[in-house]
Amino acid sequence: MIKFSLLEQIVLILFLSSGLSFFLYQLLLRLKIVLKGKSDFSIDQLPDRLLRVFNEVILHKKVASGGRKFAGIMHAFVMYGFIFFGLITINHFLMAFGIHLFNETFRLWYFKIFGAPWAFLCSFGILALAYRRFVLKPKALGKFSATSGVVTIFIVTLMITYLIDELYLLKSPVALKVNWWLHSGVIGGFLFLIPKSKHMHLVLSPFNIFLKPFEIPHHPAIPIDLEASEEELDNLLLDLSRLSKDQALDIFTCVECGRCTDVCPANRGGGILDPKYHFILNLKQPMLDSGDVNVVDKINVEAGWECTTCQACTEVCPVGNHVEKADEIRSFQVLAEGDVPQEYQKLLRNLQETGNTEGASSSDLLKQLPAYTSDKELVLWLGCFAKHAMDPNFIGSVKNFTKILDSAGVTYGVLSNEQCSGDPANKLGDKLTYQLLMDQNVEELNKVKNVTTMCPHCVVNLQKEYSKYHEIKYEVKHHTQVISELLEQGKININPGSLEKVTYHDPCNLSRTLDEVSAPRNAIKAAAPDFFELDESGKETLCCGAGGALWWKKDSGEGRTHLLRAEQVIESKTDTVVTGCNFCY
């Protein structure tokens, strides 16, 4: 048994106290900044939040997903090693004061069942991760990280010194004490290292995963009162530069894994946008320097305009970050700076003057379909694509859907005064134009109960986005959801067609934002037996490149974002590709 002098005990107390004080100071500094953010955290749906923590923290489902199963398992070895060594660490320091948590029997049992196995697994895990970072060097991990190297050395040292002690490999009292102090020094070193590095996620990620909004994307509403005083409008504009509390917590939680950049369609298409840096890491130091969350103006403007707002970055993040901040920088640029890119000025002017994206009159389709009356079951919301003939081929799709409704005996009608849902204005940051369109639409739609549309962008806005500003009294469904329900109810029967290989491209708004991947497949499989999945499908779908209002930038010739998915489809050698979105189409 090692004996410690009073001086050694005092040195240990001072060392640990300074480490804990530094750690707590840095933690509280960050939390103080986070609490300056706008919009409070929500803790509704408590059982679902706890289940999410269990799945994503304890089971590591997100960490081990997206083609990173091996890295995820290695990370789990390290994380569980820290958990199982919690009691061992407490006992280790109490030994210096002659206190022992374990009797000899329990100590040996714990060593055999947990200590020894996890010491080896933890060492193997961290060495495998170090090999991946320093030898394989995945692009997503970014530049060389000396801190990661130090952490590797620290963890391996902890495991070795623990095993040396437990296996009685040292006989000399001096050697035993040196080993003990080395182990203690490394643990104390972590207290100084963690707060100043990405490894702060060890503390923050469980809380971030618990607190993160269920809604994707999650951007606080920006209500604009046209009758507000000049002071109130000034405060609104100042507020545009501030992050919300959950966005600020995201930035301090980031583990710098680069998964967001890996899946970003703009980055993959050759653009400058790097979500890991532009939306997260580049804001971290400005927040620490200023002690505040007024950092939206630090986001790279050009990168912000490249974003398709597809939410792939948010979907893949293993620590619960809502990564995308294009909405914040665009709203700041448009509303606070009055800076609208040239390619979008006509679009916004059309929305303001005519209520639709094209500044066009209604197509003949509006006259060919029945008008909605209160005795009908559904409002068929056409959207700009169909109502204003933005794509003549899409009008044929709308007519085919109405044939399905007719066959099922479902009554429906269209609204003659339907305005654009405002999605392009919302995505471009013009919240004033968006609110004007929204107010008109909500006034009409709150008179009905059920709405269906073929445009996922319209579904997101009519249902989810509008509810941030208004009480919504109606329900909106995507047309594939309606078809799937009619199939389940036996109201329509489909004879499998003669189509050969058929695949499906998941629209981002339908799969990630609305969490709907089953309904379209139910409908397709009923008609096409030879169905297969694309490489990136479901909630892992690859954006077509038209989201975030970038469809109106399609003639710019910049980047290859819009070609990536098309190339995947061609390489799949499918005969037919189906999609549930007019923009993807």
Residue ranges and their predicted role:
Residues 259-265, 269, 312-325, 513, ...:
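Short functional micro-motifs and their immediate structural scaffolds
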Residues 2-128, 243-251, 274-466:
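Iron-sulfur-cluster electron-transfer modules
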Residues 191-304:
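Ferredoxin-type iron-sulfur electron-transfer modules and their immediate structural context
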Residues 158, 255-258, 262, 277, ...:
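Feature representing long, continuous alpha-helical segments
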Residues 23-42, 94-98, 128-146, 164-172, ...:
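Juxtamembrane/interface segments at transmembrane-helix termini
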Residues 183:
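Conserved histidines in hydrophobic membrane contexts and catalytic metal-binding motifs
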Residues 89, 94-179, 188-204, 242-243, ...:
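Long, contiguous internal "core" modules enriched in hydrophobic/ aromatic residues
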Residues 170-176, 219-233, 323-585:
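Iron-sulfur cluster-binding electron-transfer modules in prokaryotic oxidoreductases
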